């Protein structure tokens, strides 16, 4: 907890003004205030009207917001109030509002909240304004705002004190409004296709559903250690067993791993599961989600991102992982080979072989991550991941070395992960046990055995297609943002 700092001169003056308001019988931290308009509604309705037309109409309005600018001398003043939608100018005359109201205006500081009732008008300069008739003091700001005209420029302060960033940086404010709209549209898209939105536990006895290191905590009442979820997958698939058929969850997951421009320890995912579907159906669903967001939120398929044009319209490219490696690195993993042969290839291509690697599949994945990922700029579905790195995915019928799984890559980064779900409980148990062995050999991201989930599968789960999308990265793409911290209202800070 931050310590209370010593008051500077500005803060002392603001507290004096707070006491002056109280002495005048005015509550410096007011109560409910009813508006007739926000700033956007006023601009949309009246920006096209002339000064004379507005005078003829003699319309009145009631607005409220934070005082962002104030100027004027003597008996006339101008100011701008800022609400969620933007700003509206105030025109305040002492002979219109009276002595008491004009004193409120004169003594108001930037950052204070005011409610204003008055006539909707235009000034001689043509700016839409409210000519004040009555002012109501709503809240005293005891600290000054950051830089008046240039916004908040210190990056760390923007992240630690996001409220100041939102007040002073309209671009940042709009980015988070866009984030909310994106999430709403994803919900609308899924709901419209018959999916049920559900909620599953954040605290779990066993962290599963992804290859990641979890955060641990202790449940005092039950006296057991628990893990914060690293994915929502296993509980959602239990609901498929239970007959819910089409489910999704939008929520936070937690991974105790590194932080960089595209990773934060807590982040938002959307996972969905659909009975009787396979991974190719889920490719279509994924395309649909991205294209729906493009159409409804940003209004275009071609996005400017990281100095590149990304086209999310039409069919996304689809390529098998082995073919992608062959094309980029010139190494062919289609012919069957021993682990020793694959290890030799890895050393030839400067790929480190971890001690928990036990199969060719691990080597294939390392080749892909080192040589291929960064080349995938336009939306690309990479499918056919090795079985060893896909413990929850169904094996491919034609080549059981690989799975019916895909990842969506854009600009060299993963945006989605999906597969035809493994629904054979015997195979699932064997893969869990292989993961547990890898964990013993030092693989921090390997999971343990979730016997309860295996038991659920033993009751029968229909063929199912599942999807996971990283919402934060999706928002980054659609807002042209290259740092994940700029799309998280309160990113993790030391």
Swiss-Prot record:
<dbReference type="GO" id="GO:0000049">
    <property type="term" value="F:tRNA binding"/>
</dbReference>
<dbReference type="Pfam" id="PF01336">
    <property type="entry name" value="tRNA_anti-codon"/>
</dbReference>
<dbReference type="GO" id="GO:0005829">
    <property type="term" value="C:cytosol"/>
</dbReference>
<dbReference type="InterPro" id="IPR004364">
    <property type="entry name" value="Aa-tRNA-synt_II"/>
</dbReference>
<dbReference type="InterPro" id="IPR044136">
    <property type="entry name" value="Lys-tRNA-ligase_II_N"/>
</dbReference>
<dbReference type="GO" id="GO:0005524">
    <property type="term" value="F:ATP binding"/>
</dbReference>
<dbReference type="GO" id="GO:0006430">
    <property type="term" value="P:lysyl-tRNA aminoacylation"/>
</dbReference>
<dbReference type="InterPro" id="IPR012340">
    <property type="entry name" value="NA-bd_OB-fold"/>
</dbReference>
<feature type="binding site">
    <location>
        <position position="414"/>
    </location>
    <ligand>
        <name>Mg(2+) 2</name>
    </ligand>
</feature>
<dbReference type="GO" id="GO:0004824">
    <property type="term" value="F:lysine-tRNA ligase activity"/>
</dbReference>
<dbReference type="GO" id="GO:0016740">
    <property type="term" value="F:transferase activity"/>
</dbReference>
<dbReference type="InterPro" id="IPR006195">
    <property type="entry name" value="aa-tRNA-synth_II"/>
</dbReference>
<dbReference type="InterPro" id="IPR004365">
    <property type="entry name" value="NA-bd_OB_tRNA"/>
</dbReference>
<keyword id="KW-0479">Metal-binding</keyword>
<protein>
    <recommendedName>
        <fullName>Lysine--tRNA ligase</fullName>
        <ecNumber>6.1.1.6</ecNumber>
    </recommendedName>
</protein>
<keyword id="KW-0648">Protein biosynthesis</keyword>
<dbReference type="InterPro" id="IPR045864">
    <property type="entry name" value="aa-tRNA-synth_II/BPL/LPL"/>
</dbReference>
<dbReference type="InterPro" id="IPR002313">
    <property type="entry name" value="Lys-tRNA-ligase_II"/>
</dbReference>
<feature type="binding site">
    <location>
        <position position="414"/>
    </location>
    <ligand>
        <name>Mg(2+) 1</name>
    </ligand>
</feature>
<keyword id="KW-0030">Aminoacyl-tRNA synthetase</keyword>
<dbReference type="InterPro" id="IPR018149">
    <property type="entry name" value="Lys-tRNA-synth_II_C"/>
</dbReference>
<keyword id="KW-0436">Ligase</keyword>
<comment type="similarity">
    <text>Belongs to the class-II aminoacyl-tRNA synthetase family.</text>
</comment>
<keyword id="KW-0067">ATP-binding</keyword>
<dbReference type="GO" id="GO:0140096">
    <property type="term" value="F:catalytic activity, acting on a protein"/>
</dbReference>
<keyword id="KW-0547">Nucleotide-binding</keyword>
<feature type="binding site">
    <location>
        <position position="407"/>
    </location>
    <ligand>
        <name>Mg(2+) 1</name>
    </ligand>
</feature>
<keyword id="KW-0963">Cytoplasm</keyword>
<dbReference type="Pfam" id="PF00152">
    <property type="entry name" value="tRNA-synt_2"/>
</dbReference>
<comment type="subunit">
    <text>Homodimer.</text>
</comment>
<keyword id="KW-0460">Magnesium</keyword>
<dbReference type="GO" id="GO:0000287">
    <property type="term" value="F:magnesium ion binding"/>
</dbReference>
